[in-house]
Structures are given as C-alpha cells and as structure tokens.
Design a protein with these regions (language model features):
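N-terminal, motif-rich segments that launch catalysis or mediate targeting to/interaction with membranes
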Residues: 2-88, 106-142
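Short alpha-helix carrying the canonical HExxH Zn2+-binding catalytic motif
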Residues: 87-95
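Short active-site segment of divalent metal-dependent hydrolases/proteases
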Residues: 95, 99, 103
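Long, charge-rich alpha-helical interaction segments
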Residues: 137-157
Length: 157
C-alpha cells in the first residue's frame, strides 16, 4: 500500500514553518496542535471520502477558489471572538495554501505535458521526503496524527 498523497509534505512543511514563528504563535499552536494539523491538510482532507461524492467535489471546488475571502472571514472571526482554536486551524490552512501555491504550477505543468500524473507526482514527492527524513513510506502513515472530533468540526464551521 502506498502512502496517502501529499500528507507528509504538508505535515513536514508545517513543522518547519513552526520553527520560524514567534513564541506567542507557537504557544497558540501547541495548545491547539490537532486543529493546526487538520488545517495543514486544507481541503485535501475532503478527498479521502468516496470518489465523486459531494464531499470530494467540495474539496475540488475549494482548490479552485480564491483563498483571500476565506482567510479574511476566518481572521475576522478570530479577532471578534479571540478564538485561538480557529487561529491555529487557519495557520495550518495557510501553510497548506502556501505549499500548494508554490508547488502546484510545476505539478500542473508536468501533468499537462503528460510527464507524470498530478497524484503520482505528489505521492513520489511525499515518498522522497519520507526517505530523506528517515521514514519508511510503506510503514509510516502521517495522517494518523489527524484526529477527528466533533469539537474540532464546530471550530472549523
């Protein structure tokens, strides 16, 4: 069984970004690490549902939308409610957005030229990162750290 595409890259990127954040922001993330980790997967987390389902289609639509209104609305709620949980989620989601925005032009170009499919390129990128960081791609499942809870869903919605 191959690893889930892109999961490890987003987790690793979030870990690396974390080291550059202010102590105050790191504290917010430490207190709400599960929400941060869920945010790291952005709308990709919706792709793990049944193919062609409403949930999966929502993830596809979210990838095509302009992100600014999403972040503006989220940060408005953070400021209004002083909501550190939502802030941690949005920080993770921002990491997801930054990594996708940087990598996807190359991914799309390779897929368009039929060099390699989008999903396979992302899987291979994850596999390479796992090997470079000492993880066995066939025994390491980075998504195991994503813990679904109704309380997290309420924060996100």
């Amino acid at each position: 069984m191959s690893p889930m595409p892109t999961t490890y890259a987003h987790d690793l990127f979030g870990q690396r970004v974390y080291t550059f954040l202010t102590p105050e922001i790191r504290q917010v993330i430490r207190k709400n690490k599960n929400l941060f980790r869920i945010g790291l997967h952005g709308p990709d987390i919706l792709f793990y549902d049944i193919p062609n389902s409403r949930v999966t289609r929502t993830g596809i639509v979210m990838h095509r939308e302009v992100a600014a209104p999403f972040f503006e609305r989220g940060m408005t709620l953070v400021r209004q409610k002083h909501d550190e949980k939502l802030l941690a989620y949005l920080l993770g989601f921002a990491c997801h957005y930054l990594l996708d925005s940087t990598c996807h032009p190359y991914v799309y170009e390779m897929a368009e030229k039929e060099v390699i499919s989008h999903t396979l390129l992302e899987k291979e990128f994850d596999r390479t990162l796992m090997l470079e960081t000492g993880k066995n791609p066939y025994h390491y499942y980075p998504s195991c750290g994503v813990i679904p809870r109704m309380t997290y869903a309420r924060v996100i919605h």
